[in-house]
Structures are given as C-alpha cells and as structure tokens.
UniProtKB/Swiss-Prot annotation:
InterPro entries xref list: CAP-Gly_dom_sf, CAP-Gly_domain, Papain-like_cys_pep_sf, Peptidase_C19_UCH, USP_CS, USP_dom
Ubl conjugation as UniProt keyword: yes
GO biological processes: innate immune response; necroptotic process; negative regulation of canonical NF-kappaB signal transduction; negative regulation of canonical Wnt signaling pathway; negative regulation of inflammatory response; negative regulation of interleukin-18-mediated signaling pathway; negative regulation of JNK cascade; negative regulation of NF-kappaB transcription factor activity
Enzyme class: hydrolase
Gene: CYLD
Descriptive protein name: Ubiquitin carboxyl-terminal hydrolase CYLD
Membrane topology per record: Peripheral membrane protein
Subunit architecture: Interacts (via CAP-Gly domain) with IKBKG/NEMO (via proline-rich C-terminal region). Interacts with TRAF2 and TRIP. Interacts with PLK1, DVL1, DVL3, MAVS, TBK1, IKKE and RIGI. Interacts (via CAP-Gly domain) with microtubules. Interacts with HDAC6 and BCL3. Interacts with MAP3K7. Identified in a complex with TRAF6 and SQSTM1. Interacts with OPTN and SQSTM1. Interacts with CEP350. Interacts with RNF31; the interaction is indirect and is mediated via SPATA2.
Keyword match Metal-binding: yes
Membership in a protein family: Belongs to the peptidase C19 family.
SMART domains per record: CAP_GLY
Chain intervals for the UniProt region annotation (Interaction with TRAF2): 391-466
Length: 953
C-alpha cells in the first residue's frame, strides 16, 4: 500500500467539514516525517477523510503514477495523516464508525466489520435491551441488560460507543463496576455486577432470530461488474449437421490475446461430442472441460434457450470476472436441484477427482426440491442452523426428508434448506452447477465393478482447519462448492486423504456417495463430491455462526469416554529398561494433550515417567500450614497421573485438566486451563504455592545468604569461540561469572537453557552432558587441585579463561601449585580465595587420592519448537535408551476432536551424543536424523538426578 505520513501539531478545520470515514483493508507501513520512525497502521484502523489537502500539507505522488488516493486522518493516532489507494479502504458510515472505534484490537474490529448483520444489530442495542455478554474468551456468555450506551470519554471528534451492562442471574458478581467509570456514575447497579464492553463482546437476545442469512460475512466490495452474455450453468443448443445438440455452459469469456474476436463459449454436451480440453494457447481456461464431451465455439454459433427470469447476483456473494445480471437461460427438460453459484471462469484446479457415470444424465429425471440433512450430534457445528424457518431466504419450502433407509441408521436428521444464494427458476427448480468428468486423467479409468458396501477404514483425523466428519466445508473454486463432510479417508491406490462431501446442491458428474465403485456414504444422486481433504476449508458463510465448544468444560469423562485412563492407588516405582520400554512405547501412550497443555504434559512426563527422584512430593502427609486443596492435588498427581503413567503408560487429558483447574485456584495464577504457559510457571505454582515442596536447590552468592529455588536458569554472554557448548561448561561458566556455589548437593537439578523466550536461542546446538560433575560447584566439599590432583586450598576465578591451564574449567589449586601458578607475570594481580572445606575432613582421604566426586545423571530433556513442548527421557543405562514423547502427536477429529499422544524410541540420539563437539558443530542441523535434531537444537530444560538419592533405592 502506498502512503505518506505527516505529524501535525493541530488539525485545522477544513479537514473536518464533512465527516466521511474509511476502514483500512490492509496494513500500511508509513514514515513519520518529523521523527523518521516507521509506523505501522494495522488493517482495521479507521480514518476520517481529509477534504482539503491544501492546508499545511503537500501531496505525496503515488507509486508508479497511481491515482485515486484518499487522504485520511487515523482516529487512533491523532497526529497521523496518510494517503492510501481507494482499493485499500472501504467507506463506513458514522454510526458504524462509533461502534467499531470502541474495539481497540484492530483485528477483532475488522472481523466484526465483515459480519454486517451483527454490526447492524449493534445499532439496535439501546438502554433496556436484553443481551448476553462475553466476559472472557472461551467461557460462557452471561445474561444482562443494557443500562448505558455512549462514549466513556468524549475527548475526540468521534468517540467509540460502549455499552454499560448490568449482569443478571449467574453473571452477578462477575463484573468489575457498579456503573462508575473514572469517578463518573454512568449507570447504577450492585457492586461487581456491571461491565463496560464494546459491541464485539455483546449479543442481542431476540425472540425470533431470523438474521441468519445476513450473518454471512461477505466482501467489502460489492460493486457490480459486467456479466458475460451467457451464464455459467445455463442450457444452450447448437446445430451440428442436421441435428440439434444440447449442453450446459461451463465457460464464457474472451480468449487471451484474442479479445477482439468477442466471447467464446465452452459447452459440456449431453452426448459425447467434442474434443476441447479446457486450454487455449497453453493457458488453462476451464478446469471442467472433458475431451470426450466438451466443445469450444464462438458465441455466434450458440443457440441460447428461452430466458426464464432475470438473474441478480446473490446477496453478499463474492463477484468474479465474468459475473453479472444479463439473464439466465434454462432448458425445457427438468433441471437438477442446486445452488446458483457465481458463474465465471474457473481457475485451474486438481482438487476434484472423477466420480462415476456420465457428466449429464442421458435420461431426463424428475428432481425433488433441495433438502439438506445434518447429523444431530452433540457438537455438530451446524447444530444452531437446524431450526431455520422453512421460508428462509429464497429457497422453496423443504419437502419431507427421504426415507431413513437411505441414510445412516446411527443418526437422526433434520431437514434444512441450506443455500444462502439459491435463486429459484420460474418452475420452482434450482439452477445447478455442472461437474463434468474433467479429471479422468488424474484418476485413470473408472472402476465399473459392482458397488461395495464395506469401504476401506476411514481416516479419522481432520486437517489443519479442524475439519471432521459433520463439518460444514467449502471447496475454494470459482464459484465455490459448499457441503457437509460425510466421510474422510484414503481409498486404495491413492496417497492423498480425501473428503467425501454431500453438496448442498446437485452437480453434474457427482454421485450418490460412491467413489470408484465403492460406497463411502449415502446421499441423493449427484450430490457426493470427493476432494483432497487439504483442499477443504470451513464454510466461510457461517464463520460467525459455528459455535466453538468450551474446551475446558468439554474435557470431561463423558466427552473423552473413549480416551479415559485408570486410577491406581498403589505407590508405583517407575519401570526401567525393557519392561518400561514395552509399557510406554506406541500411540495413545504418555500423557494426552488438550487445549494448550503441552507445557504441562511434557514437564510431568519428564519428571515422573522414568525417575523417582521427586516421588517424595507424592507422599508427604498434609500439614497444618498446607492449602486446603493440598491433599486433593497430591492424590490426583499420585493416583491419577503418576501411577497410571508408570503402570499403563497412558494418562487421559481429563486428569490433566483437573490439575489445571486446581492450579487456577492459586491467587498468583491465571490462564492455566486455557493459555500457553511455560514449564517454570507450572513448577513454581505447583511446588511452591500448592505442595510446598522443599526447594530443590540451595545456592549461595559470594558469602551471602542461601537462596532457595526449584530450577536454575543459565545466564551468560555468548562466546563466539564456543561452537557447541556442553551443559557442564554452561553451568560452570554461569556459576563462575555470578560467583555462585551450591550450599548443598541437590538430589534433582533442573537447568534452564540460555535462551530468551521461546524463540531466541543463544546457541544453535547444545550438547546435553549425560553426566554432570558438580564437585567444584559445591561449598564445604574437598576438591582436587587442577595441577597435581591433591587437595585444593585456593580457587581463582580470574584463571577460569586462562588458555594455558585447562581453559574453560574451574581453577582450584593446592597451596604449592597456587603459588607457582601466580608467579607468572600475567597472573601476579589475580585475586584468589580460600576453598571452604568441611571441618571434620579425614586427613587420610586426600593423602591417598580418595577425594570423592559428586556427579549427577541426565534423565530427561524438555524441548520447545514453535511454542510446542515435547520431551526426551532416558529409560535405561544404554546410550541408545532414549524415548521421544509428544502429547499431541496425532489428532482424532477436528476442532472438537482429540489429541493422540505418542511415545517413540529414538536410539539415534545415543549415536549423536558420542560425537565430538567439533563434529557436532560442523554438522548441518538439517542433516541430523530422526528426533535427535530437536534434542540438540531445541533444548529448553535439562533434568539431572543424583544416582544415590532415588526414593526407591
């Protein structure tokens, strides 16, 4: 978007003589001429039109000589004036402007703007109107009554309209005001029973909700464009020799490079006549041309059938090139029921698979008026659409649904006239959209074998758009196809997952639910379309109507009936080696993820799947100072999460949701049931606030008091000389630079990697040391001299980076070696300190070289990539005994489906951990095989345990 921006001290009056407002349709990047700073004006921002450009401003030439620019003063940025192309804005009236300005999030504002019906209803909401209020995202709406409507602060020329609502019934006490805003009483209600909200948080309660049709969020540009002389889907005839042949128009437009010749028409013939493949001069003009039955002729050679009615563009439908209102043509034989889609040139597509039968029936068939059938299931996205009155829109009243033997015996059905854009012909039928056998080359010859009634096993997982069986779907063609998904699966011989859609309207070339001779579902003839699942999108017309289930309340034993896990009362140590491997490995193993729970799933799996170092947390009896829900939390962790995980290798998401709800009881916590969190947040709330776990780490800094904590975050500056650091190096360097020591040897050491947030990593790869020697990091512990191996008496932090003496290692020396080392001229000014030793250190220990080492073993690594946490755990002694866990590895169903956790072996990790640091540094991360790349490149926390402090040893 081309634009210019100025800073103005004061906007003079000629700008505001006429109040015309525009909303930006895309983001604009502009430069402030005074500060030279780049500012972003987001999509959804609102500006007031500048009528007089001569006052204090100079016109900025448009890029590449573009004209028709509009000058705007952005209302949210009072000193910002910019010029934008006309195509990048849409005019809105002042009343809409006031409603939208109250929504501070421009993205949400733009979303509401597209929902014209809801925006229009906002004008009707006034004092006394009953409404529902959305207080928090994802939660239920509370009933209320509007007590105030207007601006909260009338400081600007145009102010946003807010609504003061008194909450009723279950909403009482959930608000935040008694009607006072910034000391001014705008309405009166009880304390905490009122809220001030913008329109996006309100829903008008109506006795009769008949506004479904206009809830379709159409485009902002509704300008009419010239239509071609013949309408797509219209019936035509042509004379071939002595006979008249009929067909359906599938293309009508000028040819590229031959515009002067006028319109050409592509006709899908009723009989196998023609040889046009949809191309002209190598350009694909039509995706539905069949070389067996399609012909391309000049429009003068085409005989249109009688005109039955004047066609108008569908309300709020997207208009494409070649769309208009020249009139439609119909054939005298009965037409198939279907929707009047926007005609126009179809883009090339490989979405559609050939079905069976000819593209147009050879025998005329009487068609019933269209009905749509939707499974009545608890969480069907279309559930709210099933009570639409029969006279909705332009569709004819629905007939009785077909006999139940043609439908699934497992469901009950509702009849629903579905299409928002159907326009009936004079005979009551609906014009249809042909789908010819245009892609036989994709599928090969059709199988004409008898229909099989036992299709291959359906694939239950949806796609990235949350689509599943029962979802309202749209196939983005020109015009689009709309329907409901009846089947998802992978037919034999295909590598693609297909979706079987029952279209809302009949379409030439479609079936009654069969594909390649196999029946996958049952529907009316010419309504079954099979497409690639990835080519489907949620039906955009009903984006604002599809209810989003409350994922918190949905996570219960009823909804998750097929995924429930056991309760185990008996205390269970972790199973190791082969036994543990066999229990834990496979799909539907580990902890099931649900609704942003991966941070919690992976952390719990790391801590308890194959380690007992923290099992004391599960066993400590309740004390008088514990929170009231201490026992509930501990029992839940022990019997419903840890023990079942160790015995059966699986924990259901409902158990984790119980824990998440408990976490939210803590005053310092919020969002644990729904938001993305970090493992350290979870550990702090669980260990410190609820279970009051004894701090895992006791650390002292330079003789100060001991500090307690549960994990240690490594802070350090990046050393360019270090390619791939080890955890040993990082921990020692961090301790030396901060002058820290462990006051006690920890039984469990959780180390957070040096990174900032979820994205920025200090090192591209980190080597997770399998063994951590913390001897030199402990207070009151005998340590070896770095030179002779004797008992160290002094430590010198300044010698740490000295390349001449074991570079990158902590330097402690005996009395003799310390004197020798510091005789060197470059070390003369070093300040070394005495090593603190235990008072009762046996004299013979160090003299006989028996200075003990304190070592810890790596037992788990928590990793993060693109905000998703996964876990690596070690289940045995062997170097290759590694497992990889992902709580959301697979998906069963769409938005209201279920995540399938998975635990997989990853023995390749052991091979990479045997490599030298130099080899790892030179290794391209993209060439690291299997899961090992995530372990080496995405480590977030490394967890170590003392081999001598396990509870069950």
């Amino acid at each position: 978007m081309s634009s210019g921006l100025w800073s103005q001290e004061k906007v003079t009056s000629p700008y505001w003589e006429e109040r015309i407002f525009y909303l930006l349709l895309q983001e604009c990047s502009v430069t402030d001429k005074q500060t030279q700073k780049l500012l972003k004006v987001p999509k959804g921002s609102i500006g007031q039109n500048i009528q007089d450009r001569s006052v204090g401003l100079s016109r900025i030439p448009s890029a590449k000589g573009k004209k028709n620019q509009i000058g705007l003063k952005i209302l949210e940025q009072p000193h910002a004036v910019l010029f934008v192309d006309e195509k990048d804005v849409v005019e809105i009236n002042e009343k809409f402007t006031e409603l939208l300005l109250a929504i501070t999030n421009c993205e949400e504002r733009f979303s509401l703007f597209k929902n014209r019906n809801r925006l229009s209803k906002g004008l009707q909401i006034d004092v006394g109107c009953p409404v529902k209020v959305q207080l928090r995202s994802g939660e239920e709406k509370f009933p209320g009554v509007v007590r105030f409507r207007g601006p909260l602060l009338a400081e600007r020329t145009v102010s946003g309209i807010f609504f003061g609502v008194e909450l009723l019934e279950e909403g009482r006490g959930q608000g935040f005001t008694d009607g006072v805003y910034q000391g001014k009483q705008l309405f009166q209600c009880d304390e905490d029973c009122g809220v001030f909200v913008a329109l996006d948080k309100l829903e008008l309660i109506e006795d009769d909700d008949t506004g479904l049709e206009s809830d379709y969020a159409g485009p902002v540009d509704t300008m009419q464009v010239e239509l071609p002389p013949l309408e797509i889907n219209s019936r035509v005839s042509l004379k071939l020799g002595e006979t008249i042949e009929s067909g359906t128009v599938i293309f009508c437009d000028v040819l590229p490079g031959k515009e002067s010749l006028g319109y050409f028409v592509g006709v899908d013939m009723d009989n196998p006549i023609g040889n046009w493949d949809g191309r002209f001069d190598g350009v694909q003009l039509c995706s539905f041309a069949s070389v067996e039955s399609t012909i391309l002729l000049h429009i003068n050679d085409i005989i249109p059938e009688s005109v039955t009615q004047e066609r108008r563009p569908p309300k709020l439908a997207f208009m494409s090139r070649g769309v208009g209102d020249k009139g439609s043509f119909s054939h005298n034989k009965p037409k198939a029921t279907g929707s009047t889609s926007d005609p126009g040139t179809r883009n090339r597509s490989e979405l559609f698979y050939t079905l069976n039968g000819s593209s147009v029936d050879s025998q005329p068939q009487s068609k019933s008026k269209n009905s749509w059938y939707i499974d009545e299931v608890a969480e069907d996205p279309a559930k709210s659409l099933t009570e639409i009155p029969p006279d909705f829109g332009h569709a004819s009243p629905p007939l009785q649904p077909p006999s139940m033997n043609s439908l699934s015996s497992e469901n009950r059905f509702h009849s629903l006239p579905f299409s928002l854009t159907k326009m009936p012909n004079t005979n009551g039928s609906i014009s249809h959209s042909p789908l010819s056998l245009s892609v036989q080359s994709v599928m090969g010859e059709l199988n004409n074998a008898p229909v099989q009634e036992s299709p291959p096993l359906a694939v239950s997982s949806g796609n990235s758009h949350g689509l599943e069986v029962g979802s309202l779907a749209e196939v983005k063609e020109n015009p689009p196809f709309y329907g409901v998904i009846r089947w998802i699966g992978q037919p034999p011989g295909l590598n693609e997952v297909l979706a079987g859609l029952e279209l809302e309207d009949e379409c030439a070339g479609c079936t009654d639910g069969t594909f390649r001779g196999t029946r996958y579902f049952t529907c009316a003839l010419k309504k079954a379309l099979f497409v690639k699942l990835k080519s489907c999108r949620p039906d955009s017309r009903f984006a604002s109507l599809q209810p989003v289930s409350n994922q918190i309340e949905r996570c219960n034993s009823l909804a998750f009936g097929g995924y429930l896990s056991e309760v185990v009362e008996e205390n269970t140590p972790p199973k190791m080696e082969k036994e543990g491997f066999e229990i834990m490995i496979g799909k539907k193993k580990g902890i099931q993820g649900h609704y942003n729970s991966c941070y919690l799933d992976s952390t719990l799996f790391c801590l308890f799947a194959f380690s007992s170092v923290l099992d004391t947390v599960l066993l400590r009896p309740k004390e008088k100072n514990d929170v009231e829900y201490y026992s509930e939390t501990q029992e839940l962790l022990r019997t419903e999460i840890v023990n079942p995980l160790r015995i059966y290798g699986y924990v259901c998401a409902t158990k984790i949701m119980k824990l998440r709800k408990i976490l939210e009881k803590v005053e310092a916590a919020s969002g644990f049931t729904s938001e993305e969190k970090d493992p350290e947040e979870f550990l702090n709330i669980l260990f410190h606030h609820i279970l009051r776990v004894e701090p895992l780490l006791k650390i002292r800094s330079a003789g100060q008091k001991v500090q307690d904590c549960y994990f240690y975050q490594i802070f350090m500056e990046k050393n360019e000389k270090v390619g791939v650091p080890t955890i040993q190096q990082l921990l020692e360097c961090s301790f030396i630079n901060s002058n820290l020591k462990f006051a006690e040897a920890p039984s469990c050491l959780i180390i957070q990697m040096p990174r900032f947030g979820k994205d920025f990593k200090l090192f591209k790869k980190i080597f997770p040391s399998l063994e951590l020697n913390i001897t030199d990091l402990l207070e009151d512990t005998p340590r070896q001299c770095r030179i002779c191996g004797g008992l160290a008496m002094y430590e010198c932090r300044e010698c740490y980076d000295d390349p001449d003496i074991s570079a990158g290692k902590i330097k402690q020396f005996c009395k003799t070696c310390n004197a020798q080392v510091h005789l060197h001229p470059k070390r003369l000014n070093h300040k070394y300190n005495p090593v603190s030793l235990p008072k009762d250190l046996p004299d013979w220990d160090w003299r006989h070289g028996c200075i003990p080492c304190q070592k810890m073993e790596l037992f788990a690594v928590l990793c993060i990539e693109t905000s998703h946490y996964v876990a690596f755990v070690k289940y045995g002694k062997d170097d290759s005994a590694w497992l990889f866990f992902d709580s959301m590895a697979d998906r069963d169903g769409g938005q209201n489906g279920f995540n399938i956790p998975q635990v997989t072996p990853c023995p390749e990790v052991g091979e990479y951990l045997k490599m030298s640091l130099d080899d790892l540094h030179s290794l391209d991360s993209r060439r690291i095989q299997g899961c090992a790349r995530r372990l080496l490149c995405d480590a977030y926390m490394c967890m170590y345990q003392s081999p001598t402090m396990s509870l069950y040893k």
